[in-house]
Amino acid sequence: MSIKYIASSKLPTPWGVFEMHGFEDSETGKEHVALTLGVFDAESPILGRIHSECLTGDALFSLRCDCGFQLQTAMQNIAEAGQGFILYLRQEGRGIGLLNKIRAYELQDGGANTVEANERLGFAADMRKYDMIIPMMEQIGISKVRLMTNNPRKVKAMQSFGLEVVERVPLQVGKNRYNEGYLKTKSTELGHMMSEHHFTEEGKD
């Protein structure tokens, strides 16, 4: 495995002081981060999330997606539980990178949905991989998870690596008039498990 643990430090946030653990992929050069809060019992399921980098949503407060809302809600949920983790993976734009994501947004501005835009650029709908989570989870000492996600691929990925997903915790947050179509596409074409209320006009916040 090409993932190497580098260092850890404290990370004060609005939701508490997390521990930040840095990892480097020697093959790709990408740097991944695990955030942890609290003390873990190896036999108890720990609340957590696998979160793929989204500069536009996480840092620039974009309303085109639900990523930033999911990250903040996950951190808040972990703080309320008193323990938990987030694996922050550098897989911008479902794995196509930031500039290609902007190209995809340009196509979406012209009427394509998020899947069609990726495919027109020559990419699969979702290019992400999750094998890097194995050494990350080993380093932070977690094998049983209550996973905050709407994406069944993340559940299957964890299970395929021998991690026990005791519960899937839905994260249906961040719906607004700019991302209703995006959320619907994630549900109908990417298989994300969301209630229809979360992406329909009738369920508008």
Curated annotation (Swiss-Prot):
Annotated residues for binding of GTP: R49, I50, H51, S52, E53, Q70, E92, G93, R94, T114, T149, K154
Gene3D superfamilies per the UniProt record, alphabetical: GTP cyclohydrolase II
UniProt keyword terms in alphabetical order: GTP-binding, Hydrolase, Metal-binding, Nucleotide-binding, Riboflavin biosynthesis, Zinc
Cofactor details (free text): Binds 1 zinc ion per subunit.
Swiss-Prot/TrEMBL GO biological process terms: riboflavin biosynthetic process
Pathway membership: Cofactor biosynthesis; riboflavin biosynthesis; 5-amino-6-(D-ribitylamino)uracil from GTP: step 1/4
UniProt-listed CDD domains: GTP_cyclohydro2 (cd00641)
Superkingdom, natural source: Bacteria
Presence of keyword Kinase: no
Top EC group: hydrolase
Annotated GO CC locations: cytosol
Binding positions (Zn(2+)): C54, C65, C67
Cross-referenced Pfam families: GTP_cyclohydro2 (PF00925)
Function according to Swiss-Prot or TrEMBL: Catalyzes the conversion of GTP to 2,5-diamino-6-ribosylamino-4(3H)-pyrimidinone 5'-phosphate (DARP), formate and pyrophosphate.
A GO MF term: GTP cyclohydrolase II activity
Signal sequence, start to end: none
Similarity section: Belongs to the GTP cyclohydrolase II family.
EC number annotated for this UniProt entry: 3.5.4.25
UniProt-recorded name of the protein: GTP cyclohydrolase-2
UniProt KW Electron transport keyword: no
Catalysed reactions, semicolon-separated: GTP + 4 H2O = 2,5-diamino-6-hydroxy-4-(5-phosphoribosylamino)-pyrimidine + formate + 2 phosphate + 3 H(+)
Needed cofactors: Zn(2+)
